[in-house]
Every structure is written in C-alpha cells, then in structure tokens.
Amino acid sequence: MRIRADVNAYFRSAKIRSIRFIRVPFCYITQMDINDIKIAAERIRPYVRRTHLEYSNSLSKRIGVHTSVKFELFQKTGAFKARGAFNKLLTMSDAERAKGVVAVSGGNHAQAVAYSSSVLGVDAVILMPANTPQVYVDATRGYGATVELQENIGAAFV
C-alpha cells in the first residue's frame, strides 16, 4: 500500500529528529519526534482521561496491518482535541496565559479550548460561525468561554 510506505519512510527519515516550523495559511505545522510526544503525554496526564484501545478486525483487514482504535469519545469534551488544547496552554508562560486565549472553531476544538482554559483558569474567547448548531454554542459557553458568533468563519480572521 503506497500510503503506508510513504508514512513509514517519513517516520524513518532524519527530518523528524528536530523540530522545525512550516508556514501554511492560518497554521503552523510542527515536526517532532517520539520524545516530544512522550513529554507532551506526561504534561497533560493529570488533565485528560486515559482512554482504551480496541482492536479493529475490519479496519485491520482493510489496510493490511494490525490496527486498534482509541476511544477518545470518552474524554470530557467527547473528542481528542482536549489533548492538544491542554498541551498548548500548559506550554504557554504565565504571562501569556494571563492575556487569555482566542480560538476559532464551530465544534470540538472550541469545546476543548473552552474546557482546558476553564480548568487552568485562563480566559477564553471562542469565535464561532453564526450557523454553528446551538448545542455546540451552549456546550462551549457551558465550559466558561465567551462565545462570539461570526457571520462566517473567514470573518474571524479579519
């Protein structure tokens, strides 16, 4: 399978031995190695739930390798996004956290930032599209964030 070969080659390459940033519109992609992942896992351990893995027979057959799925739906916010939100907030300085955070999302990322900010005592403003389902808006507010609705997601970047 070509994709699997490409992924394996990438992870064996020397490129990932050091962190570097790649500029992409509206985001930065960070390259990291397994030690960075272990450090992040330890950092967020007190704040996230350890979810279980389950072997997937159908997925394993489909892609040709032993595959397990991780049940991140059991995180407090119902998704894996809390891991990244906690990790980011925990790597910010006290001065940076004191300024608060702003996120743009109409879904799981919004709730993850709102929840992790609330737990860590950081003010959060979440910009959400005006057509975001009310259940997501309510959940995000329920975690303590200030929600500002935008006519479209692009307006949040202006």
Question: How should these model regions be labeled?
Answer:
Residues M1-Q31:
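Intrinsic disorder/low-complexity segments
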